[in-house]
Amino acid sequence: MRTVSLIIVHCSANKAGSALRTEDIDRYHRSLGWKCCGYHYVIPTDGTIEAGYPEELVGTHCKHHNSHSIGICYIGGLDDGGTTPKDTRTEAQKATLRKLIEQLHQRYPKALIVGHHDLNPQKACPCFHVTAEYIDCLLYTSPSPRDMRR
């Protein structure tokens, strides 16, 4: 089993309300010469979770960090005109993303929860401050000081 030290949140950089699905991302990533959809999970606007790359395998979503991370992508991230980065998550996406991050952090309690832009400041992705939004997930699932002494 590989060591996962990062849970990285991305956006697909599509217009608000885009009907994009995992198979669309898969097709695009294959056109770039990748094996398949580089994200482990994709969250369309309806809030469902779609599986991308198997979690136990290394994805292709964040240069220099793929080997030790899980990649989650929500569909959206651009304004209605498709030109300006914007947090376009639907309420369903927000709820699903929170649940998925909580589940992943329980499986990988030492993993940091970050946005793509936290690792590459030239990116706007995912268009919101991931660490600030999910700090309570880290606090809730972090080991207690007693557990850390073991």
Segments predicted by a language model, with ranges:
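Secondary-structure boundary/capping signal
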Residues: 33-36, 109-112, 149
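Basic/polar, cationic surfaces and motifs that engage anionic cell-wall
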Residues: 1-12, 45-49, 54, 65-68, ...
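Cell wall/extracellular polymer interaction/catalysis modules
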Residues: 1-40
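Short Gly/Pro-enriched turn/cap motifs at secondary-structure boundaries
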Residues: 31-32, 61-63
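A short acidic/small-residue loop/turn micro-motif
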Residues: 57-58
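Single conserved hydrophobic/aromatic residue that forms the stacking wall/gate
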Residues: 140-150
